[in-house]
Amino acid sequence: EFSGASDVISGKVLENVPVQHLSNALSGRISGLTTIQRSGEPGNDEASIYIRGIRSNGNGALVLIDGQERNYYGMVQTQEIERVTILKDASAIALYGMRGANGVILIETKSGRLGKPRVSLNIQGIYQQNMRVPKAVNAAEYAQSYNEANINDGLNPFYTETEINKFANHSDPERYPDVDWIGNLLKKGTFMQRYNATVEGGSGRTRYFVSLGYTGQAGMFNTEKEQNYSTNTEFSRINFRSNVDFDITSTTLLSVKLDGWMQSENSPYHDQAQQYIFQNLLKTPATAFPMYYKDTHNYVDQSGNPIKSQPGDRIVAGNDKYINPWAILNRGGYTAIDKRYGAFSVSLKQDLDFLLKGLSLYGQISMDVYNLQKQNRTRSFNYYTLQNNGVLQKYGTSEEMISNAAMKYGDARNTTLNFKLSYNRISGKHNVSGMMFYDQYEYNQSIVLPYRYQTVGGWFAYKYDNRYQIDATFGYQGSYKFNNENRWGLSPTVSLAWYASNEKFFDVLKPAISNLKIRGSIGKVNNDRAVSAYMYMSRLQNLNEGIYFGNDMAQYTSLLETQQANPSATYEKSTQINLGADLGMFSNRLNATFDIWKDRRTGVYTIPSTFSSMLGYTTIYMPGKNIGKMETKGLEGSLNWKDNIGKDFTYFLSGNISYSKNKVIDMDEALQPYDYMYSKGHPYGTSLVYIADGIFQSYEEIAAAPVHTLNSVVPGDIR
């Protein structure tokens, strides 16, 4: 039993959560864990995960699946998960070296059990809709507000009353449109579907668990159906997993795990498709132009030639001020992405009781491969502006066929080696445990340099009479990011636990309090996630410019040093303290945990502001240094109730609370005229902004207020 700060959530709790990415299934279920989902786009709705808040520049948690680091953990089907463990304090994360300084998430998938084959089928249909959609004003309201804004700025009204009335009565919708862009291009809701089938069982020396799943998610856009291709945001994925255990002998266990998935994504073409479309949805007013012109008006172009729409090719409206959101969505082309992923691992566990009772050896090798194929199929389109004489003025060119853009390929391969020597022995009142390990993680990708981490470490625990426990943990890891002198870092920690409920004097409280454990830990861990690789080297950039000299006056290009080398660059250091308690009451039907903690970081990698201009550098080219200091404090707690009603009905209630606050201690900042302009004393990343102090109601208030230096103000402006 571990004495550090950790939380465990059963896979049964996650099994029916209707999400396509696992990160969203963890949201709100574990104290100290925060998720932030920045997009709802199908296939790209992964949430960022923070354990115990934001504590420095690099805050990502390390995620392992069955003991192996996996970059694509979110694609695991919830029906495949046995349990998820969150490691929080220094004593829990030290074994994982510089990669685990911000917390570790351990995902354990299911294994087979002896018995006849058991088949499970899970089918889900989920209706999804936007939590909140901005409601735009109609054309008449927009025109009136526009006029009011002009008057407030001392200008003449832009729209006449006649024009406003035509916007309102829709008598001429193509000259005086009233387009609800959001309502027309966004669906009220859409569907996601999930299917999963599992088979598990075993006989003799073999046990197996096999899972096959499918997830499909439709987009929220209303797109044209006349095209033979889709420009909507769509997503589908097929998952497979096979976990097989073989008892080679009574003391030798061989485990083989295979998993993989195939995923297809589709979206409107643009580097930031959804963001670009939403920007234009929100900024294009209802008065700008119709989505497209209809054939009922017998339109002609400048030469008098009739203009007719064709199947899949409408007469797109537009002007030189706004880009037609409908045309961006339906005429700009699309992006198709296909992703493929496969992983396998083989492990062998050998009991060594014949050498020393309680001794065992474990070894594992694993590899995963990832491939991405991306195709952008782009199309240009023309648009028309309706002139006062009824002629449609044409702008731009239109391609009949979508052009094939260059396909982009990306592939990656990870290889991991693990070896562990473990010992566990109980003798009377004494329980002694220990583990020594070696871990190597190597990453290879086609477009970046390969890199490797190597870690050795150990864990030693002693428990006396199930009442007192001490754990000592260390990790010693080397990071490819730094030079040889600064590459390796030691992470030592110690933790203590007192099982108060096992004391004799506690027996009188046992009817009410089933379990009480008081624990504490302190340790130093290291973090290299906030530092870019190879900062100990200079970086040079070819400027394609240079000096002309020689008999032929040829140009010789020059180089610019865009990064000055910092051979002292290294990892940041984190000293963490944790105090906590675990409480079980009423035969452990009610369980509670509480932790209070502090994390102080030194050597935070940052760009110094106090340097001489004589160096010839700006902050863009200035090398970073390990000079920053930060501190984060917090507390967290959880409360759970689980009980049965009869033999067949189980219910549970749970809740948790988390709080953390970060502040900058030192960032080597340049002198500022006012104290509030320093980062020191404020949370990391705090923005310096003006604070609104109401609205000016009259010119008298403006005259009495401090002088505005940014612009002139009138009644109605923010003061």
Please name every model-derived segment:
Residues 50-56, 296, 699, 708:
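Short linear motifs in intrinsically disordered
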Residues 14, 60, 243-252, 258-262, ...:
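Extracellular/periplasmic, surface-exposed regions of secreted and cell-surface proteins
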Residues 1-241, 254, 620:
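Short, small/polar-rich motifs associated with maturation and membrane association
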Residues 120-171, 269-281, 642-719:
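Conserved small-residue
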Residues 2-4, 174-176, 285, 397, ...:
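A short alpha-helix capping/helix-coil boundary motif
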Residues 130-132, 173-213, 217-220, 231-322, ...:
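Flexible loop and strand-edge segments within Gram-negative outer membrane beta-barrel domains
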Residues 383-384:
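Active-site-proximal polar cores
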